[in-house]
Amino acid sequence: MKKNLMLIFGGVSFEHEISCKSAYSIYLALLDLNKYNIYPVYIDKCTGVWYLLDSVSDPPKPINTDVLPIVSLLPGFGIFSNNKNLEIDVVFPVVHGRTGEDGAIQGVLKVMDIPCVGAGIIGSAISSNKYFCKLLLKSFDIPLVPFIGFRQHDYFLDKEEIKKNVKEVLGYPVIVKPAVLGSSIGINVAYSENQIESFIKEALKYDLTIVIEKFIEAREIECSIIGNEKMKIFSPGEVVVQDFIFYDYDAKYSVIPGNSIIFNIPAHLETNQLLSIKEYAFLAYKNLELRGMARVDFFVEKKSGTIYLNEINTIPGFTDISMFAKMCSNDGLQFKDLVDNLIDYAFQSYINRKKRIDFEN
């Protein structure tokens, strides 16, 4: 008998459109597998209302919210639409950014007692916050580019002291980032103190916590991992960016890969670099208690060859140009089998958790 799978996408997020593209790729894989009854659920970008769709398309069909059935969640009873219990067996969330990768949806599904593809609450929440994630990774002796972080309140209290720290601790140029946002949105490179204030103000539009890092000339290496306690680390790939300062949002989604953006899979690395990248990816995945999947991004400094972990994505992109699935495919795991494996990991993780908590006996 087929399992009932809910594919959740969209979301109140700056990465809404990317989520829709990722969902379409996964939807096609699920159709090809023919193992699941698929319930696509679209989260409206403005209202956050959940709607049940018949299918997923790319480009998305116009959404008529006046006629689409709304999805409601009743803890202890199930997920309903049109007064019918959908009897969902597993959920595959592909909501990028806020509410999707920060532990929010994962928390809701844990309350609902439904298996969920990907990381749990803690791993999602920590990984999504670049500042707290870096603090934790630093405690595990994982190399990071020098950084500082601060809250909006601290900045308005003493912005001159923070600008002084940027100059003395990091030195220019630096990268200014909102702590919680993906797809390189809201990120700028400041080459002098004259630029830093405007870039901090821009980043504060997206989040209340800011991370500032030393800017280095580096290769951008990515590494895919899947699994729970036992994990598989795939051969890393490299994103070669030729017409951009770094792999920002425009480079990722506004440019057709070609002369400007080149994907090298596998990446051309020295043996010691390859082993170090896989080791750091393993340590991050393990110590942040991740499960299901992640894409771990690294910098390799061009002059010295020094490796730095950049960030971790617990719901990586699944679009046709996304590196996560491409790296898996390069090592022999085809897209539909990747999707199937991720669903299996969700069931395994759920069973392991239920073994530890049983209030009925």
Curated annotation (Swiss-Prot):
InterPro entries: ATP-grasp, ATP_grasp_subdomain_1, D-Ala_lig_Van_CS, D_ala_D_ala, Dala_Dala_lig_C, Dala_Dala_lig_N, PreATP-grasp_dom_sf. Gene3D superfamilies: 3.40.50.20, ATP-grasp fold, A domain (3.30.1490.20), ATP-grasp fold, B domain (3.30.470.20). It is found in: Cytoplasm. Mg(2+) 2 binds at residues 311, 313. Pathway: Cell wall biogenesis; peptidoglycan biosynthesis. ATP binds at residues 167-222. Its cofactor is Mg(2+); Mn(2+). The keyword Magnesium applies. It comes from the Bacteria. Residues 134-344 form the ATP-grasp domain. PROSITE patterns: ATP_GRASP, DALA_DALA_LIGASE_1, DALA_DALA_LIGASE_2. Binds 2 magnesium or manganese ions per subunit. One of its GO terms (biological process) is regulation of cell shape. One of its GO terms (molecular function) is D-alanine-D-alanine ligase activity. Its EC number is 6.3.2.4. Keywords: ATP-binding, Cell shape, Cell wall biogenesis/degradation, Cytoplasm, Ligase, Magnesium, Manganese, Metal-binding, Nucleotide-binding, Peptidoglycan synthesis. Mg(2+) 1 binds at residues 297, 311. Cell wall formation. This is D-alanine--D-alanine ligase. It comes from Borreliella burgdorferi (strain ZS7). The lineage of its organism: Bacteria, Pseudomonadati, Spirochaetota, Spirochaetia, Spirochaetales.
